């Protein structure tokens, strides 16, 4: 038994994700060229780590050769507080108000991956949340969740 994309999206919604898209894993040469040009122009500033794994970042198959599909998700991290609630001279970004989003997303994504693995012991997958050499915006765009610009 293998799950359909509809079933996977429904399960992701059950886990709390508001946005779910699935893209076929493929090479994205234009995006890889954009990354290389961006790095050559030193537009990464102090983020030198981006250059360290640019070959993996620029081509998903260099990072995860077995990839067949990429599931991209979105989760609203608004917790209902405002800057006025702080009553202070400093500000926090919305993502910093709640629990560490890396942990929250990873837990939900591992639950989704483990559920998908029920369909077949041959399913292979990895969970990436903001720290892996993956161009997440590219995959979100490819999955129909938005655009880059």
Where are the regions that the model predicts?
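Auxiliary alpha/beta "docking" domains used to position bulky ligands
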Residues: 1-149
